[in-house]
């Protein structure tokens, strides 16, 4: 869909996008697995380089359908290539809910972001948390950012305003927002009015996190067993800063700020 020209203003910006699907059925038409990928209209440069042109408003992209068995990895690669050839920023969505195997989607370099929190499927069936897969990819050396989303359906349970990203962009323009997303200059939030990450500073081997009042800060690291740390507030209190000294063997770090209700903000 593309509603930019209907709703865009100086204070509100629509990012045109589409979700494409592939479905593996059993012989009784029961859903075995799915791939869902989002394509968000990229920067002007990405649009100009789109090999297949751009998707149009209300254009339907037919789902890929298979029965019994499939090469799930090749399907993911083909779907990502289709979105990339149409000038899109690409996210891979809700792998736990989709019941896919890691080898079917843990592929470096073909999509920009892995959805680690899906508010709809958290409320539907408790299958919306996906950080384990993200860490698997990061531990394997695949550089991929993460995102949180509502996946809003307005169905039988609340699924709006519970998953979103906070972007550090120069201004509210399409290219500035997309450049920030491409470069990972944002953090993701799970939960209505969840925590805020104000700043992450790496000074030499010291990591310092500043955030809104939370119950704990997890500094998660790649490397040896036991890498990273958790800083918890004293019982009944909250913290707004946490720090850790790196030992130099970490392969990556990321931050989680968690409040007393379990609402979480994730850095890239």
Residue ranges of each PLM-predicted region?
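Charged catalytic cores and adjacent phosphate/nucleic-acid-binding surfaces used
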Residues: 27-42, 99-268
